[in-house]
Amino acid sequence: MKESIAKVYRKTGETEIKSEINLYGEGKYDIKTGIGFFDHMLNLMARHGLIDVKLEAKGDLQVDSHHTVEDVGIVLGESFKKALGDKKGIKRYGTSFVPMDEALASVSIDISGRPYIVCDFNFTVDKLGEMDTELVEEFLRALAFNAGITLHARVLYGKNNHHMIEAVFKALGRALREAVDRDEKINGVMSTKGTL
């Protein structure tokens, strides 16, 4: 499958982020956000989605991790949209259920051009490492709205918060992989409207 590479650079008063992704990669990653737990989750997304991701973020972590996490979502969303191009031949939809020990998460994606997000999480701790658990939803929202996708993410059950979030990011990677895969039987885009 041919490469689909996008580079995005974004600088604001709060963050500076540069990224390069290949949607049809091997799951290679080199991710540095300054937030260890977040790096770990993004590495999992890349590996399990077979998406190559190089990303470096410098943010105002002396304030907290909110701006960095959200802006990484913005940049990855923009990268994803750019790499997809005209969306011809992609399957459009992707769904994945991923277990992580006692936890089970699901992510469903529609590369629709209509950004929307639904999250159903019940985390029982406020923080893992240096990352607030509420920022999982902020990241997913920024990703979805900047990529132009509908995204539903849910933790069906679990006790360990690390396991729950890890299952979400693995499921995200796998759902993305399924949605962007191309099918030679699809003529144009997967829509009766003729556009996504």
Swiss-Prot record:
> What are the record keywords, sorted?
Amino-acid biosynthesis, Cytoplasm, Histidine biosynthesis, Lyase
Reported EC number(s) for this entry are 4.2.1.19
Swiss-Prot/TrEMBL catalytic activity: D-erythro-1-(imidazol-4-yl)glycerol 3-phosphate = 3-(imidazol-4-yl)-2-oxopropyl phosphate + H2O
Query: What top-level branch of life does the organism fall under?
Result: Bacteria
Q: Which GO CC terms are listed, alphabetically?
A: cytoplasm
Please name the GO terms of the biological process aspect recorded for this protein, alphabetically: L-histidine biosynthetic process
The answer to keyword Amino-acid biosynthesis applying to this record is yes
Instruction: Give the stretches traversing the membrane.
Output: none
Top EC category: lyase
The record's section on CDD domains has: IGPD (cd07914)
The cross-references to PROSITE patterns, in alphabetical order and at most eight, read:
IGP_DEHYDRATASE_1, IGP_DEHYDRATASE_2
Q: Identify a single GO molecular function assigned to this protein.
A: imidazoleglycerol-phosphate dehydratase activity
Which pathway does this polypeptide act in? Amino-acid biosynthesis; L-histidine biosynthesis; L-histidine from 5-phospho-alpha-D-ribose 1-diphosphate: step 6/9
Question: Where does the protein end up?
Answer: Cytoplasm
Q: Hey, which family's this protein in? A: Belongs to the imidazoleglycerol-phosphate dehydratase family.
NCBIfam families listed in its UniProt record: PRK00951.1-2 (NF002107), PRK00951.1-5 (NF002109), PRK00951.2-1 (NF002111), PRK00951.2-2 (NF002112), PRK00951.2-4 (NF002114), PRK00951.2-6 (NF002116)
The protein, known as: Imidazoleglycerol-phosphate dehydratase
